[in-house]
């Protein structure tokens, strides 16, 4: 099995070759609780020693110029008219981030162009949030002129802006906790509660004698197999929240049962866009179960109960109908992973 080796110089050092304000952000990895953000659930996320760095400087010619380089030799560059939205891809993602920062008054409304240079040690496709780290580094560099850029409230606001921009301008699903932890995470594990937007800390699993590795079937491209299913699920949960008048389904008693009743009523009324009742039940039950597992894992970390933590991590989750690398997980466990 090939091992990834990071470059010998840091991305912040490499990006200083470009002019402008420089900032960096860490890669992230999810311990438990992925895909429960729209439900209002809880996700546990750690930070990686691998980082992405960005250098930004303003332009006055109506152009957003992007140059990005990853650790596997990938390079991306684009010259974008400031006022014309690109079709898709990284260009649209980061063009949209600049415009969202302007709309939220983090950047001046007089902004008319930008040079953006990104250097990253985080390999795309490794499950370490490479694009999220780059988003966060760009946003930090662009917002670096604010006196309160290092305060928790400003970082929380910046994370929300990043997630909103990616949700609006990228075809990839966004996991908001990754932006939050890339911008606000510490050495331990961050516990992100979507019900109230809080981010608290729990001890790192390494104190129980384990090391955390990323194992991937292939590197170089983001994992996209389940993006349509994730988008469908999130749209359903958003619609259910609107129907029941709650900000998250986590606030709704007996959420799986009531979601099924609502879907059945829609289908009986001739709504052809309503999902299958059993699929709706599985979606909500998964989010509910995964949130409970996340809360229990955070409690186990904080109370130093290693056996309970690893039992939780290895216990099967509710059916989620999303693509997952089950064979790779089985191989890793066969080779000694816990």
Per-segment meaning from a language model:
Residues 2-32, 53-92, 190-338:
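C-terminal nucleotide
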Residues 47-49, 59, 121:
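A short, compositionally biased micro-patch
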